Amino acid sequence: MDYKTSGVDIEAGREFVSEIKQAVEGTHTSNVIDGIGGFGGLFRIPVDSFKKPVLVSGTDGVGTKLELAQSKNFHFEVGIDLVAMCMNDIITCGAKPLFFLDYIATGKLDKKQLLQVVQGISHGCGENNCSLLGGETAEMPGFYSNNKYDLAGFCVGIVDEDKLINGKKISENDLIIALKSNGVHSNGFSLVRKIIQNNNQLDKEFEKVSHLNFYDELLKPTKIYNNVVNQILSENIEIKAMSHITGGGIPENLPRCIPSDFIPYINTNSWEIPILFKFLKEKGTIPEKDFWNTFNLGVGFCLIIDKQFKDSILNICKDHDIDSWEIGKIVRKNDSTISKFLPEILT
């Protein structure tokens, strides 16, 4: 018996590395010192551009969205999801992404599938001037089934310590600007999959009420907000805090970037919740609180700013084809504001 007989094909792994080389190296900036194939990725940190450079790291996956995406052959899209989930986290403190690493684990190496995944990762990186510096593809027979894979991503960025965005400058009456999501993004899919299991004709019913393809809408890749945030900051517009709206929705994620003596007042009438979310709520009979604490409901990212910058930010978002709007404001925390300003769903 040899390694291949036991389920690990070393030669197929070598061929896969060769096939992804063009996509990976297409993301490399001038700071990448060497190509793929070494034991470690080498990256020259652009310290000359910063007074006190601070590295910022983030890691994430795509969750159980992978199960549904793999069954519908949305492999390229989940590659973008992987980059988005990591990159959107690290940019909240003002960091510019430098490089990305990926980890792919599978029961049996399907080069056609995983090439699409890596192409998606490369696309997400390339669109955001972030080098795909390296990765690992692990063939694990008996641990994963042959037609399944899992993904993890790791993103590293850089910011000047004096320009860190941490919410400490937030004050009363600052505005909260919402940036529209691309759909469900990569959270809540354990609930989504259960709803699908319990409703055989869900895709046809959705198409009937929306005239949209259910799985095309459901599996849209997570929006990456790096470029729009980077432009806002490059125009010397102060952002006091940012929040990536992921698992836990607005109620869980927005308060994370706000000092404890303030709370966010969210005007829930300031936007129309997209039809996909309403459809899932109806078909899954999801309670209101769970609805808000599971999905982003059309809000993928939030900025907290002084009101003087509102129009400039909305215009920049428009230039990037991202819908944005004033979703609320910051109020000082006390018993009266909690009962007066926060809707019941957010308490």
Curated annotation (Swiss-Prot):
Chemical reaction(s) catalysed: 2-formamido-N(1)-(5-O-phospho-beta-D-ribosyl)acetamidine + ATP = 5-amino-1-(5-phospho-beta-D-ribosyl)imidazole + ADP + phosphate + H(+)
Extract the GO molecular function terms from the UniProt entry.
ATP binding; phosphoribosylamine-glycine ligase activity; phosphoribosylformylglycinamidine cyclo-ligase activity
Keyword Transmembrane helix assigned to the entry: answer is no
Q: Its Gene Ontology biological processes?
A: 'de novo' IMP biosynthetic process; adenine biosynthetic process
The places in or outside the cell where this protein is found are:
Cytoplasm
Which keywords are on file for this protein?
Answer: ATP-binding, Cytoplasm, Ligase, Nucleotide-binding, Purine biosynthesis
Q: What is its EC number?
A: 6.3.3.1
Any one GO CC term of the record: cytosol
Record pathway: Purine metabolism; IMP biosynthesis via de novo pathway; 5-amino-1-(5-phospho-D-ribosyl)imidazole from N(2)-formyl-N(1)-(5-phospho-D-ribosyl)glycinamide: step 2/2
What the entry lists under InterPro entries is as follows: PurM-like_C_dom (IPR010918), PurM-like_C_sf (IPR036676), PurM-like_N (IPR016188), PurM-like_N_sf (IPR036921), PurM_cligase (IPR004733)
Signal peptide span: none
Q: Does the keyword Ligase apply?
A: yes
Q: Which family does it belong to?
A: Belongs to the AIR synthase family.
List the protein's name.
Phosphoribosylformylglycinamidine cyclo-ligase
Q: What is the lineage of its organism?
A: Bacteria, Bacillati, Cyanobacteriota, Cyanophyceae, Synechococcales
